[in-house]
Amino acid sequence: QNGPRPIGIPP
């Protein structure tokens, strides 16, 4: 279960 990635981490 993945939450939102922090800004700066590429998708």
Curated annotation (Swiss-Prot):
Keywords: Hypotensive agent, Metalloenzyme inhibitor, Metalloprotease inhibitor, Protease inhibitor, Pyrrolidone carboxylic acid, Secreted, Toxin. One of its GO terms (biological process) is regulation of blood pressure. Its main location: secreted. GO terms for molecular function: peptidase inhibitor activity; toxin activity. It comes from the Eukaryota. It is found in: Secreted. GO terms for cellular component: extracellular region. Expressed by the venom gland. The modification Pyrrolidone carboxylic acid is found at residue 1. Belongs to the bradykinin-potentiating peptide family. This peptide both inhibits the activity of the angiotensin-converting enzyme (ACE) and enhances the action of bradykinin by inhibiting the peptidases that inactivate it. It acts as an indirect hypotensive agent. This is Bradykinin-potentiating peptide 11i. It comes from Bothrops jararaca (Jararaca).
